[in-house]
Amino acid sequence: EDFKTDMDCAVSIERRIAAMKQVYAAGIRTVCFVSPVFPGLTDFEAIFARVKNQCDLFWLENLNLRGGFKKTIMDYIAVKHPGLRPLYNQIYNRHDRSYFEALMRQAEAMARQYDCPFVDNEMPYGRVPQGHPIIVNYFYHEEIRGSENTGARHKKEDK
């Protein structure tokens, strides 16, 4: 909650989860969009445990740092979470994808553990059995932009 407050002025996480539960109970398809996943800070498995019985889709998107926003976040990490500076340097200055590749494998394993579908850049519609939301990988947004959620990615080697 403290981290959320540092990042935005929206209502509390508890209020968001309570609202999601009410909407889900009313029969409306719900999505838990975990975005951005901050390396070393966002525990998406803990979030999943809290919401899996009240959402149909569980989206994951990594933190993308572009433009002036990069300096703002890197400065925030340096001040508030200095122990994470090497990790953020590895990811955002050295362009090492291994952290998020490992998180993707972790999300796939979580999907298997909870018998949930795992899709890459897709937008499935409809309700799912309670407790088995579809886990959607939206890591590396720059690769999926313009793909219309078809599952296609535009990797550097594809260009």
Where are these regions (language model features)?
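C-terminal accessory extensions appended to soluble enzyme cores
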Residues: K70-K159
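Conserved AdoMet/S-adenosylmethionine-binding subsite of the radical SAM
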Residues: E1-Q106
